[in-house]
Amino acid sequence: MFAVSSRRVLPGFTLSLGTSLLFVCLILLLPLSALVMQLAQMSWAQYWEVITNPQVVAAYKVTLLSAFVASIFNGVFGLLMAWILTRYRFPGRTLLDALMDLPFALPTAVAGLTLASLFSVNGFYGEWLAKFDIKVTYTWLGIAVAMAFTSIPFVVRTVQPVLEELGPEYEEAAETLGATRWQSFCKVVLPELSPALVAGVALSFTRSLGEFGAVIFIAGNIAWKTEVTSLMIFVRLQEFDYPAASAIASVILAASLLLLFSINTLQSRFGRRVVGH
């Protein structure tokens, strides 16, 4: 007969929606509109010339390769760390859990300086890696290391709540039915973790695409070799060439939005499939 309205913690729909839209407009849409206004000052030919400049294309390749390697590493290592933090109890677990958020709290410039000193030829890690003829600083590998460090929390914090909700009883039930631990993980746990894991890896990848502070200290910014797109944008801004900087940024922005939209679409379909079952 009559719809019974449940008590809500937040205010009414109109006020909540209005506040949310105001936040979106001021924090998200306003910067994007400024970017579009800068792009409007360029013709299509000028825009194409900027984004297809050989040096810019080389920076795109270095950025994408480094971000891809970093996100894959974070996917594996982040899943392992989330598993350890949720499935085991040991001394120092709380400290280890807190350390997973350190890249969020640490300024990226400080992270870059620290990584550069550790992986330099005379550094703690770099000296050992040099014995195997592996050089990290001033290479794309160093960029990947910096990107992985700054974006690892995205995977850990995305997968960890799902693992906590899943609980070990599902694995135990599978093992009582004759499955090995590896089979129970692959056939029971991993399918449930896949949406969260993919989302975490995607967030790690998109975060890495725009990394600047940690990268510039370990990459060396060698033209055609270790330049990333964020550095190219910074150089254009220093030259007061705002339209060119906006053009380069628009490519990374479009790639990030496309990836995030695809991930959200896949997650929505997965959610509907689970509800349907």
UniProtKB/Swiss-Prot annotation:
Q: Could you tell me which Pfam families the record lists for this protein?
A: BPD_transp_1 (PF00528)
Q: Where are the transmembrane segments?
A: 17-37, 64-84, 99-119, 136-156, 185-205, 215-235, 243-263
Q: Which CDD domains match?
A: TM_PBP2 (cd06261)
Q: Which InterPro entries match?
A: CysT_permease (IPR011865), MetI-like (IPR000515), MetI-like_sf (IPR035906), Sulph_transpt2 (IPR005667)
Gene Ontology cellular-component terms listed: ATP-binding cassette (ABC) transporter complex, transmembrane substrate-binding subunit-containing; membrane; plasma membrane
Record SUPFAM superfamilies: MetI-like (SSF161098)
Q: What is its subcellular localisation?
A: Cell inner membrane
**Which controlled-vocabulary keywords does the entry list?**
Cell inner membrane, Cell membrane, Membrane, Sulfate transport, Transmembrane, Transmembrane helix, Transport
Regarding the membrane, this protein is recorded as:
Multi-pass membrane protein
Q: Which GO terms describe its molecular function?
A: ABC-type sulfate transporter activity
Q: Name one GO biological process term.
A: thiosulfate transport
Domain ABC transmembrane type-1 residue range list: 60-263
**KW Iron-sulfur (keyword) present:** no
Q: Indicate the family of this protein.
A: Belongs to the binding-protein-dependent transport system permease family. CysTW subfamily.
Subunit details for this protein? The complex is composed of two ATP-binding proteins (CysA), two transmembrane proteins (CysT and CysW) and a solute-binding protein (CysP).
The function of this protein is: Part of the ABC transporter complex CysAWTP (TC 3.A.1.6.1) involved in sulfate/thiosulfate import. Probably responsible for the translocation of the substrate across the membrane.
What name goes with this protein?
A: Sulfate transport system permease protein CysT
Q: Which organism is it from?
A: Escherichia coli (strain K12)
